[in-house]
Amino acid sequence: MKRDHLFYYGTLASALLPVVPACAKTKKGNASVDNRPQPNVIVIYADDLGYGDLECFGATRVQTPNVNALARSGIRLTNVHAIAATSTPSRYGLLTGEYAFRHAGTDIARGNAGMIIRPEQFTMADAFKNAGYATAAIGKWHLGMGDRDGEQDWNAQLPMHLGDIGFDYHYIMAATADRTPCVFIEQGHVANYDASAPIEVSYTQNFEGEPTGKENPELLFNLKASHGHNQSIVNGIGRIGYMKGGGRALWKDENIADSIAAHALGFIREHREEPFFMYLATNDVHVPRFPHDRFRGKSPMGLRGDAIAQFDWTVGQVVSELERLGLRQNTLIILSSDNGPVVDDGYADRAVELLGDHRPAGPYRSGKYSTFEGGTIVPAIVSWPKRVKGGQESDALISQIDWLASLGSLVGARMPKGSAPDSQNRLGTLLGEEKEDRPYVLEQAANHTLSVRTREWKYIPPSKGPAIISGPGIESGYSREPQLYDMRRPYEQENVSLQHPDVVFRMQAYTEQERNKGASYTSPISK
């Protein structure tokens, strides 16, 4: 499905308006597509969006009307946990149903990492595909491209890409907006490829004659770094990693949300007469936060608040298109985030200065990277008007690791033996039809610490590391002593491990039980 890549290069808000006439045919045969037994499914996966970053989860310094409406139309889930406190391991677990700690090479991925999910593995996309769905991944990827680390030829068809793991269509960022290469990948090719500017990427050394943020700070005309992010400069912003070339294929950060939204709407239109699954992973609100001009000033919190408003707009675009095509009633939308929030993650965007009384993690302690609850508890909304009654709220304990098995069950997917080894079918809880807690969830911090959370308790095992993570200035939760917190009390303030040795023992047993299951798959990739 080839698309016009004009979306990178201009405001082109008009390009996002519906291009199919309002009276367009939305029936297949005599049956309305909205009355098919299989729902369309869209997972909207935000980046670094905290529990307290949305109005419907308590935010007062940013307006999120589209997300608020989505919550009113369905169920607000208040006890959902990402699989890890950082991006790559959370996304790996979500899409494979396997905890990332079982699989080598699932730390925060470089932009030239090889495919972390291998073709032999069963994925969420595979589940939908074998149930007869059209499948797509659009937006942030951060799970590697090509066969092996650092061996990609970005000027040719990548030998291994998302088409090999169940996605019929993909339009993705190779890693994140702050890492090279700063191009989109569509169907295994660099999108809008410019043959006059061949692409080279390195994470070990710069290319001769190419400026860097460290040596040429005068070229950082859009955003300067607060820490790190001082290697290659693209669009006046320093990045992690080095690259050369790109030309017309290079993105402009202010147009990333437009481009992602446009391709998402295009996929919906193209597949409106068949069931489809879309993994829509936004760049917002990850750094560098550089939203389009039309979102500037939407929040008193500066660029971070404006990026939240831009995320809300993306949600509104998707919902509006579904409504226009007559698909909204039978489309299941799940909205959540890959990990907790971070305020200063490497750019001088005044996010700390302008935060005011906003609490990105809501009532929870710390944020991204951390073992504390703010690292992994995330906002979540489920909306499916045909089946899920609106205006609900559930505090059932839920882990994103279970979404593959749950959604596979919903659509009648054939799940091969041994696939999604950590994913449990908890569809009833996800849809608000039951309030049953998961017995426990595992939460992986940036230093690989595996915490255990039940409804009442949070156990953090001893680990090494600084109390404060330098750069973002986040409390790590790392301690050489075991920590046990009663989650019925606020903010993980009192370590009660000595008072409750029986609970500590039980929580340790959960961790050992999971570790002893071992890895189900060993990647041939050299890391």
Roles of regions detected by a PLM:
Residues K2, F7-A13, C23-P482, Y491-K527:
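Formylglycine-dependent sulfatase
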Residues R488:
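Flexible catalytic loop/linker elements that gate and position reactive groups at enzyme active sites
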